[in-house]
């Protein structure tokens, strides 16, 4: 039956049923929540039962555990993430029924079509930068819509439909899907060699993709570029669009001066165009987070948010899930009290930045790291860089690689990485087969007063939460 738009009154009522395959993923769940708020009938399936699926179910989504062809029957549109295989039964059924299929990024682009879009791209720092930008615009009274790849702790969610005209979202370069977006503002935080398996193992193709991303801006659009990053700086010099730069470099349009770390906070002077300066206390540690804050400040300044309002938003920022989350102190069975920090970092450059933030904020503590490598391909491609940065900590425990659907690659597992670190002669890493074993092994490594960083993009975050909630194995209740 052909549906007539005139009879429905609007597009939501004409095509109301949207199904998400892999609804529990960070990018998918945020879009699903916004569409729920817009009035769509949202359903979805996922192999995992997590906080995102439970939240969506509470909001009214119909969430199914596991994938089945029957799940898409009666649906008007199916949204899929790039993690979904071509032989997924729901995807195959949607094709056979000629149900429209939308990649996740394409659906985000559809949402952006009805707002003024701000897309935040870059190999590292997207989630934090997008979250800070949402906080600055909210503090400035602009009530933005946001879609973030992590939980904004102040909102208790990774997405929100705002009443204002601006939508700020992460633009995912990992699979090239950010090239589906057509924002009015585009941020690039940095460009690094990651996800090369999706670019034919050719970094030049990664560089070209970021250049094309900026080409998708309209002629009246704006590129906000971090010129402290050499790759982004090179791009800034040749992009045929309006550019505003940010960074700690003297020639940045928006820059941070007199940067110092004070425990878990950063203090600096924010210098805006036309010479305006404002003191800022950022509620996040690390110089890398100062750069993220500068991008948010540049967005706020462009949209008329007052400098003191920008500073207030940065100072009151409550953080993002799994981005240097201080989970508190835990006591081992031997009585050692340690502070536990959970972080999503999984690339050598991210590890280096987090280690620097930890040492800058807690210089007198031993730095103990429990790390779960993410993907065999990344471990292989960044093997030497991983070995170098992980050799700098005081004690290291490695769990096996989180495969993320990949088959094992010889010489790219945690035991090979431990051998390479051991050969450097600076530390003696401990290897556990399963990430759940960290709770049992860590007490033998930890000393009183240590700072324990639990890092990785897999399921190590659940172990960190479990340790804080239930204690280490063998510890008194």
Curated annotation (Swiss-Prot):
One example of a Gene Ontology biological process annotation: cell wall organization
Record's catalysed reaction(s): UDP-N-acetyl-alpha-D-muramate + L-alanine + ATP = UDP-N-acetyl-alpha-D-muramoyl-L-alanine + ADP + phosphate + H(+)
SUPFAM superfamilies: MurCD N-terminal domain, MurD-like peptide ligases, catalytic domain, MurD-like peptide ligases, peptide-binding domain
Transmembrane segments: none
Cited Pfam families: Mur_ligase, Mur_ligase_C, Mur_ligase_M
HAMAP family named among the record's database cross-references: MurC
Family the entry assigns: Belongs to the MurCDEF family.
Protein name per its UniProtKB record: UDP-N-acetylmuramate--L-alanine ligase
Native source organism of the sequence: Xanthomonas campestris pv. campestris (strain ATCC 33913 / DSM 3586 / NCPPB 528 / LMG 568 / P 25)
Organism lineage: Bacteria, Pseudomonadati, Pseudomonadota, Gammaproteobacteria, Lysobacterales
Gene name per UniProt: murC
């Amino acid at each position: 039956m052909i549906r007539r738009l005139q009879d429905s009154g609007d597009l939501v009522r004409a095509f109301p049923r949207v199904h998400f395959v892999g609804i529990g993923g960070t990018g998918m769940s945020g879009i699903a929540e916004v569409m729920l708020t817009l009035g769509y009938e949202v359903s979805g399936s996922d192999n995992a039962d997590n906080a995102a699926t439970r939240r969506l179910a509470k909001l009214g989504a119909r969430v199914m555990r596991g994938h089945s062809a029957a799940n898409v029957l009666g649906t008007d549109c199916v949204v899929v993430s790039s993690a979904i295989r071509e032989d997924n039964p729901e995807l195959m059924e949607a094709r056979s029924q000629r149900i429209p299929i939308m990649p996740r990024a394409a659906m985000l682009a559809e949402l952006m079509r009805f707002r003024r879009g701000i897309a935040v791209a870059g190999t590292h720092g997207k989630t934090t930068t997008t979250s800070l930008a949402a906080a600055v615009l909210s503090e400035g009274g602009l009530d933005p819509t946001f879609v973030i790849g992590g939980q904004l702790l102040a909102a208790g969610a990774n997405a929100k439909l705002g009443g204002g005209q601006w939508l700020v979202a992460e633009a995912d370069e990992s699979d090239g899907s950010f090239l589906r977006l057509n924002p009015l503002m585009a941020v690039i935080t940095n460009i690094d060699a990651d996800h090369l398996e999706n670019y034919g193992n050719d970094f030049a193709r990664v560089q070209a993709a970021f250049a094309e991303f900026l080409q998708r801006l309209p002629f009246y659009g704006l590129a906000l570029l971090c010129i402290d990053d050499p790759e982004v700086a090179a791009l800034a010099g040749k992009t045929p669009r309006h550019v505003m730069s940010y960074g700690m470099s003297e020639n940045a349009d928006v820059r941070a001066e007199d940067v110092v770390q004070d425990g878990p906070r950063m203090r600096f002077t924010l210098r805006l165009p036309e010479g305006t300066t404002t003191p800022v206390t950022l509620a996040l540690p690390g110089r890398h987070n100062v750069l993220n804050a500068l991008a948010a400040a540049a967005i706020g300044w462009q949209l008329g948010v007052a400098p003191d309002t920008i500073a207030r938003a940065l100072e009151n920022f409550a953080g993002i899930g799994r981005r240097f989350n201080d989970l508190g102190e835990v006591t081992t069975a031997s009585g050692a009290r340690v502070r536990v920090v959970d972080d999503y970092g999984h690339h050598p450059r991210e590890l280096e930045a987090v280690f620097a933030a930890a040492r800058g904020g807690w210089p007198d503590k031993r730095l103990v790291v429990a790390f779960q490598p993410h993907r065999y391909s990344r471990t292989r491609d960044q093997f030497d860089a991983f070995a170098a940065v992980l050799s700098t900590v005081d004690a290291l425990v490695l769990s096996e690689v989180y495969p993320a659907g990949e088959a094992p690659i010889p010489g790219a597992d945690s035991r090979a990485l431990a051998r390479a670190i051991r050969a450097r002669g600076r530390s003696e890493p401990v290897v556990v087969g399963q990430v759940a074993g960290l709770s049992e092994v860590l007490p033998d490594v930890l000393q009183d007063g240590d700072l324990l960083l639990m890092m990785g993009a897999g399921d190590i975050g659940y172990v960190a939460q479990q340790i804080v909630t239930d204690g280490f194995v063998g510890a008194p209740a």
